[in-house]
Amino acid sequence: GRGANVTLPFKEAAFSLADERSPRAEAAGAANTLCFVEGRIIADNTDGAGLVDDIQQRLGVSLQGLRVTVLGAGGAARGLMLPLAQAGVARLVVANRTQPRAQALAADIDPHLEAQELPVRVEAVALADAPAADVLINATSAGLHGDGPTLPARLFEGCQLAYDCIYADRPTPFMQQAMAAGVSRVSDGLGMLVGQAAESFRL
């Protein structure tokens, strides 16, 4: 075959196996796609591209000039940073329960944004201090088991889209909170899954 898709918990291992890594994989520190080219293994990460494509194409929300807050500072959040910056967001905030983890992510990601000559930098805040945003993205695993952090209502003020990276057969707790707060557009991450697969296939 010409390549392979990789999922949790093997994304970091796939990244370390590769002979070459795309800027997206380097920024994410993980790979979900391996391409085999002339005996070499090339790692890429299409998760963020899948999210951006889902938001802009399927949901019709242009990210250019918008304020985006990402909840969570784990591997899922890390893979979103470079593609969101490349989409032209005006502000990119990472909010985590513990601020030092968000700060560590920002410190890791900012050199990649500089290398791509992107003007935006990652702002790291504690979840309790997260600012309102045009687009709110939940990249935490909370909600996978029907639970989820109770978020301050002010977080949803002026929000155009609340997007949960996980997908389920019913609205996630994050989506339910957003709807209760009056956010008109909410989505789970099924389209992101489809989008990252389409991007992998294109590679």
Predicted regions and their residues:
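Short glycine-rich, flexible loops that bind phosphorylated cofactors or substrates
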Residues: K11-A13, L144-G146, R170-P171
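Glycine-rich adenosine-cofactor-binding loop
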Residues: N45-G48, I55, L59, Q64-V89, ...
